[in-house]
């Protein structure tokens, strides 16, 4: 469904080549560094030409890389080249001065050459492990636009602060069907409206999981497939709406690949930042709000805290739907006025965001469908869900919380509408967001589906569910979903 191809603006020497995880300029520098190491082993007649050419090109490449911003993965390449350079240049310099050429004996040179090549080889390995994410090309007929809005709920005090005048503010990113942009149009920055915002968010996410920020620095260089503030697609049609709440500490952009795929198929996706919960939320005035939530390690206490956080998120989702309805009616100005079908709305979320989606649906009948992406249901199971629900779960292992599936199944069994629980083999908790695109492909972290298949499976299953529930397209939902894993279907009158 999604070929893993390069971005439309690729072709520049600093853009990442999909599948190679390095830019043409980085690849050139790497090859030149290897050439400097190998030069010592070439026939005497070839050594000067190879050394001079490789050294010159490497120097120019390094200068450009430092100017545009060098990635940490390239530092071992330069270090390996720097170690090899004196041994490559020494014979040339001695020859120019008329002195006999000097070369290290082979039994001394061989270990040094191997060490230099090993140092240089760490670049492609680490670039593969911590790449600049290359987002899949959306498969739908629409181009994708995106914009960011900020809304304040004047009726709701901010529960995370003690200021009695503080009101709850949320930042929302919209992805929507758009007109095709001109060739070479600048794609949207990932993780933020600007690169500084992306760096702020990336650093906060890294701190949250205990990683040095530089390891995942590639995400701040990434651009997605959408275009900021692109004109809305023509035709005058109204688009179903999908609201999304990210995982604990997660940010509005964490499911960008999924949001862009849905938008390309004619949905408007509204993803939320939850201030004081999301790792970092940059407001329109430049103020940054960092996460204040933290688990205690005590199961009952953490469950109590999670119930409270889930309730705040559920209220955020209901408020955003109200604002989108006002936008559609023209009470809030914007290009999507008259184009949002707020009579066909799904509420979705990942992890605790999935729990918030379930809770929001219980409280608000304006939501017509629910998608829970591997979210443990926190909070009360009443009132019962009345919307069709799709719950995608990771592969169940001995480390899985034994309460998870029974609690999720209970919520689906109590529903007055059909529910689906699909366990996807090879999936991990982070499979259901953009993580597989930029984190090391370690099964315990991002699953074993791979960087191409992970976003494909999540998008294919959720898109099929949305098309059936919101657009009433024909098809056997159970038959479609069962192709992707172990499916359980829960009917209002019985379960199986």
Which residues are covered by each model-predicted region?
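Alpha/beta-hydrolase active-site loop
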Residues: 276, 282-339
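Alpha/beta-hydrolase-fold serine-hydrolase catalytic core, especially in secreted/extracellular enzymes
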Residues: 14-117, 128-138, 145-146, 154, ...
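Short substrate-entry loop that stabilizes the transition state in hydrolases
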Residues: 222-239, 244-282, 398-401
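Active-site machinery of serine-nucleophile hydrolases
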Residues: 178-179, 188-215, 253-299, 425
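Glycine-rich His-Gly loop
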Residues: 176, 244-248, 351, 394-395
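Primarily recognizes the serine-hydrolase "nucleophile elbow" in alpha/beta-hydrolase
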Residues: 320-384
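The feature captures the conserved acid-bearing segment of alpha/beta-hydrolase catalytic domains
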Residues: 233, 368-429
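Domain-level recognition of soluble alpha/beta enzyme cores
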Residues: 125-242, 451, 462-464, 471
């Amino acid at each position: 469904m999604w070929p893993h191809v390069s971005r439309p603006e690729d072709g520049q020497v600093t853009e990442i080549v999909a599948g190679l995880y390095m830019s043409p300029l980085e690849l050139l520098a790497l090859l030149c560094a290897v050439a400097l190491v190998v030069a010592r082993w070439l026939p005497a007649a070839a050594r000067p030409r190879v050394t001079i050419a490789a050294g010159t090109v490497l120097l120019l490449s390094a200068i450009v890389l430092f100017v545009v911003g060098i990635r940490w993965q390239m530092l071992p390449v330069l270090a390996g080249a720097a170690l090899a350079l004196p041994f490559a240049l020494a014979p040339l310099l001695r020859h120019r001065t008329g002195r006999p050429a000097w070369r290290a004996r082979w039994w001394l040179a061989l270990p040094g050459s191997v060490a230099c090549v090993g140092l240089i080889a760490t670049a492609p390995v680490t670039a593969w492990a911590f790449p600049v994410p290359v987002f899949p090309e959306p498969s739908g007929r629409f181009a994708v636009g995106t914009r960011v809005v900020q809304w304040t709920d004047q009726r709701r005090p901010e529960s995370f602060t003690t200021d009695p005048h503080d009101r709850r503010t949320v930042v929302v990113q919209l992805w929507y069907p758009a007109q095709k942009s001109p060739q070479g149009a600048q794609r949207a920055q990932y993780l933020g409206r600007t690169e500084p915002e992306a760096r702020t968010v990336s650093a906060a996410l890294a701190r949250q999981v205990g990683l040095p920020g530089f390891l995942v620095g590639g995400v701040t260089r990434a651009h997605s497939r959408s275009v900021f503030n692109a004109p809305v697609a023509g035709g005058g049609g109204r688009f179903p709406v999908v609201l999304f709440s990210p995982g604990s500490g997660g940010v509005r952009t964490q499911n960008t690949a999924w949001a862009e795929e849905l938008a390309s198929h004619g949905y408007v996706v509204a993803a939320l930042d939850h201030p004081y919960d999301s790792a970092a939320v940059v407001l329109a005035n430049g103020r940054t709000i960092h996460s204040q939530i933290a688990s205690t390690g005590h199961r009952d206490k953490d469950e109590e805290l999670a119930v409270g956080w889930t309730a705040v998120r559920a209220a955020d989702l209901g408020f955003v739907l109200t604002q989108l309805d006002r936008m559609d009616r023209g009470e809030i100005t914007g290009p999507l006025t008259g184009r949002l079908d707020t009579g066909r709305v799904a509420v979705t979320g990942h992890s605790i965001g999935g729990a918030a989606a379930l809770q929001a649906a219980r409280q608000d009948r304006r939501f017509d469908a629910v998608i829970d992406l591997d979210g443990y249901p926190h909070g009360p199971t009443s009132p019962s869900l009345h919307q069709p629900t799709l719950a995608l779960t990771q592969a169940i292992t001995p480390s899985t919380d034994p309460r998870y599936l029974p609690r999720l199944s209970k919520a689906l069994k109590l529903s007055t509408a059909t529910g689906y629980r699909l366990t996807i083999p090879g999936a991990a908790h982070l499979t259901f967001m953009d993580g597989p695109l930029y984190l090391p492909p370690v099964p315990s972290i991002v699953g074993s589906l791979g960087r191409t298949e992970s976003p494909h499976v999540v998008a294919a299953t959720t898109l099929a569910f949305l098309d059936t529930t919101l657009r009433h397209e024909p098809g056997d939902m159970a038959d479609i979903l069962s192709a992707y894993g172990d499916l359980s279907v829960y009917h209002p009158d019985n379960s199986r």
